[in-house]
Amino acid sequence: MMKLRHKNKKPGKGSKGCKKPAKQNGKKAATKVAYSPQFFHSNDHASREAELKKKRVGEMREKQQAAREQERHRRRTIESYCQDVLRRQEEFEHKEEVLQELNMFPQLDDEATRKAYYKEFHKVVEYSDVILEVLDSRDPLGCRCFQMEETVLRAEGNKKLVLVLNKIDLVPKEVVEKWLEYLRNELPTVAFKASTQHQVKNLNRCSVPVDQASESLLKSKACFGAENLMRVLGNYCRLGEVRTHIRVGVVGLPNVGKSSLINSLKRSRACSVGAVPGVTKFMQEVYLDKFIRLLDAPGIVPGPNSEVGTILRNCIHVQKLADPVTPVETILQRCNLEEISSYYGVSGFQTTEHFLTAVAHRLGKKKKGGIYSQEQAAKAVLADWVSGKISFYTLPPSTHTLPTHLSAEIVKEMTEVFDIEDTEQANEDTMECLATGESDELLGDMDPLEMEIKWLHSPMVKIADAMENKTTVYKIGDLTGYCTNPNRHQMGWAKRNVDLHPRNNSMVDVCPVDRRPVLQRIMETDPLQQGQALASALKKKKKIQKRADKLASKLSDSMMSALDLSGNADDSAGD
């Protein structure tokens, strides 16, 4: 028989019934959090260890600082302290002066941007053993930056400086020889022509001796002077007892060919290049071989005494100019108006505004409402100037004066380190590739500064004034010479010659050229170049054949379409 439990029996301890009174009284049981004693003690120990380590590091740092201060005070005397203060003050003043004079890209008004570009340039100077200052052979003195040269020579590490005269193919041979002779009195100078090919790899470098090269090879886009430049750097590695490798910094004004020089030495598109200033913005290192590393730097511009001169040297992008009319007015003051009018096909103008209006009408440059835009016409004229359609070059001063930042000891040291006498013959070989001009007419009296205007296909003679039947003389002003030297007007002038290429092709008589490959011509070339001539002839033949096949296919398609139309017409007539 089942035993019944009494309904009033109290539940035992620990059963569910004991929770009901607690809920009725409003009391809640405290929740207990389970901690692992081992885990708790490990966290506390790690925090204590971190605090002790931080304290020990701070104490050690204070002891080291105190030891350094004690050693510094022990070694320093009053005289050395005064010398140190003067040296730091001089460095600070020089840095401030350079920051004011070296205005990188004057169209950028942000001071922080200019300082950032200056830091990139200073990094290149600091990391380099040899500095290559690239100059435009058309205006070498206008492209030189004496503040930059002074910074290089005053830098720690006994930096070496070499001048590279680039774009020698744009200047007659006699002019380049005069500039080489003039610049070698100051620093080692190397003649160079960068490659103008647009391919990515295997840029052509002329290894054939210049005296054996044909005229077509000399007028090609190949690089000249690279072997001579590499010989100069090799002489520094040999005579300077360089054990590992050297870093070579490439500096200069914008658009003088710094990146093109690096690409020509590397024989590949290692750096970005362009016909506008400001392509390179940061320092870039290029490995040439296991001994030489090249450092590309942004273009630098000396503090311009004349903004017009900076614009005409292509240091500022033409499309970013706020006032493009003033530089065009300067060009008109320096050029023969008859030649300018025949070049642009305009006539009857008396002022710069009339000239720009006529050019705008000729080129179709209009604003809203059909008004001719003088600003767009001025930018088009400046684009012709900076692109080389209106070519020019300058001549060195008749008397040479050593700049203030160079001394006879520095010149002698540079000559001995690079062994320039060994490379003079190579420079002469490079000069053989240039065109020969009439030097007697060009190297005349250079005081005051004169300008001559000549056509590209005419001899280099002075153009007579149509009104007075005499030579027209123009003063250039701040366009060339020592840009940053206050006494530049007393140091000599340079002569500037301007070429004008006619815009209309009908104005120039062009003789037809036979483009068919002839074996007799190939056999007449030098044996070292017969393979290249044969490959070029075959390539030209393939191009002509491809053009002929394309024309034949187009004619056959037109004939088939005409036959189809005639057949359809006959069928419709028969029906």
From Swiss-Prot:
GO terms for biological process: ribosome biogenesis. Residues 1-30 have a biased composition (Basic residues). It is found in: Nucleus, Nucleolus. This is Guanine nucleotide-binding protein-like 3-like protein. Interacts with MDM2; this interaction, which occurs in the nucleoplasm, stabilizes MDM2. Indirectly interacts with TP53, via MDM2-binding. Interacts with TERF1; this interaction probably occurs in the nucleoplasm and is increased during mitosis, when the nucleolus is disassembled. This binding may promote TERF1 homodimerization. Interacts with TERT. Stabilizes TERF1 telomeric association by preventing TERF1 recruitment by PML. Stabilizes TERF1 protein by preventing its ubiquitination and hence proteasomal degradation. Does so by interfering with TERF1-binding to FBXO4 E3 ubiquitin-protein ligase. Required for cell proliferation. By stabilizing TRF1 protein during mitosis, promotes metaphase-to-anaphase transition. Stabilizes MDM2 protein by preventing its ubiquitination, and hence proteasomal degradation. By acting on MDM2, may affect TP53 activity. Required for normal processing of ribosomal pre-rRNA. Binds GTP. Residues 42-72 have a biased composition (Basic and acidic residues). Residues 1-75 are annotated as: Disordered. CDD domains: Nucleostemin_like. The keyword Nucleus applies.
